[in-house]
Amino acid sequence: MTATLERRESASLWGRFCDWITSTENRLYIGWFGVLMIPTLLTATSVFIIAFVAAPPVDIDGIREPVSGSLLYGNNIISGAIIPTSAAIGLHFYPIWEAASVDEWLYNGGPYELIVLHFLLGVACYMGREWELSFRLGMRPWIAVAYSAPVAAAAAVFLIYPIGQGSFSDGMPLGISGTFNFMIVFQAEHNILMHPFHMLGVAGVFGGSLFSAMHGSLVTSSLIRETTENESANAGYKFGQEEETYNIVAAHGYFGRLIFQYASFNNSRSLHFFLAAWPVVGIWFTALGISTMAFNLNGFNFNQSVVDSQGRVINTWADIINRANLGMEVMHERNAHNFPLDLASVDAPSING
């Protein structure tokens, strides 16, 4: 009898826990994805803050030349970063217990792997939590689909690219100047600016900014005034009101006359789908581009210069880009390589005559 009561009590305790986890009445929805998201993101955030402030220099290139990234070792907010895991570790899973000591783990950049792997798991769970909450509320699933774009971009630079290049040391450093360094080296080695998928990403980000500004300004300019001239127009809106808050016909008429009639949406649902889809698809393509360049399927290169009938080079923009790429390539990891890869891979000229 006692055992039966205990089992019922434990079952009801588990049931209450399940109800609490999946309740949409909580101030912040937790959900089953949140059960994994909360500890992983807390771990990533905590280790990032500690490492950004106090981590010792990391031997990123595996050549016994540690690079300082933390504030206590001479950096500021701009130059500071979590230095990627050493090339000596490569793609090996490198938790603390795999190192001989904590000092060795820090020297080889263990915190970078810890932060990145927990972060990626956390943001993937955040995406799942968005879907889960939408499902509980009877909403459509497109919020999570839109969030998949930045998740794909993060996975591309923190996981797919290191896998393709063979080492976590090639991942993006976790800092401002480290991000710019990653971009410059990426351009030098993969000519990303000449990759069509990156071009689509640029169109997505800049186009999305333009469309967002256009939409916000059009709506704000065509509000239906419910207040006097002495009050803010914003005070005329009541949360949850059934009436339209702006005149879409006026906005459509304005924009149709500013550009031409069919450049303006007359369907609010089509408009908002477009506003969501444009940047999301662009960022999807950029993430796909990074993931293919990870395996050295690079952007267009025009290594053969245009020459005239006399064999003289006619300089084009491609020649300028090639020269810039070589300059950036010889300057990065300058003590790890004697020559940039583009020069070192060329067959040596014959000396036999």
From Swiss-Prot:
The keyword Membrane applies. A quinone binds at residues 215, 264-265. The D1/D2 heterodimer binds P680, chlorophylls that are the primary electron donor of PSII, and subsequent electron acceptors. It shares a non-heme iron and each subunit binds pheophytin, quinone, additional chlorophylls, carotenoids and lipids. D1 provides most of the ligands for the Mn4-Ca-O5 cluster of the oxygen-evolving complex (OEC). There is also a Cl(-1) ion associated with D1 and D2, which is required for oxygen evolution. The PSII complex binds additional chlorophylls, carotenoids and specific lipids. [CaMn4O5] cluster binds at residues 170, 189, 332-333, 342, 344. The record marks 344-345 as: Cleavage. It is a multi-pass membrane protein. It is an enzyme of class 1 (oxidoreductase). Chlorophyll a PD1 binds at residue 198. GO terms for cellular component: chloroplast thylakoid membrane; photosystem II. The record marks 161 as: Tyrosine radical intermediate. GO terms for biological process: photosynthetic electron transport in photosystem II; response to herbicide. Photosystem II (PSII) is a light-driven water:plastoquinone oxidoreductase that uses light energy to abstract electrons from H(2)O, generating O(2) and a proton gradient subsequently used for ATP formation. It consists of a core antenna complex that captures photons, and an electron transfer chain that converts photonic excitation into a charge separation. The D1/D2 (PsbA/PsbD) reaction center heterodimer binds P680, the primary electron donor of PSII as well as several subsequent electron acceptors. This is Photosystem II protein D1. It comes from Adiantum capillus-veneris.
